[in-house]
Amino acid sequence: MKYHKLKAGETTGTYVMDSPVTEADILQMAQQLAMSRLSKGRALTEPKQVFSHLQTLLQYHEHEVFALLLLDTKHRVIGFRELFRGTLDGASVYPREVVKIALEHNAAAVILVHNHPSGDPEPSQADRTLTKTLKNALNMVGTQILDHVVVGHEGCVSLAERGCL
């Protein structure tokens, strides 16, 4: 579903529904809006907004998903790519593939992101180890990791804010 059920409201940033919508419609519209906020060329200036968009995109998956937010030298979005899908409590992430995608998109920096289907965004030791492994691999090709964000129903945790980068 696209935004065809929405009409612009009288106030900027508001919308009016022109037909009934389901909860699934609303969630899908929220995901489309979050994706548009992470569209190519947009500068990322507010970390909390970025976390909110990432949470909207990933929090409802029933399996773990690992993704990359690819950025240029001015930290403008090049793209958002879901790279790996796993099980309820893990996903296999291959550093070679992460580096390959970063190079294919000529990314100067990336934000790593994955969800915890349990809803608890607290990073595991495996998450911290993966961050270090990917940081080393990406540094070798001149790509900086700005953050690794873990998403859950209960919120987002930034490994950068925790000093784990």
Language-model region placement:
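Active-site-proximal loop/helix of nucleotide/amide-processing enzymes and allied scaffolds
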Residues: 2-27, 32, 52, 74, ...
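Long amphipathic N-terminal alpha/beta scaffold segment
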Residues: 23-82
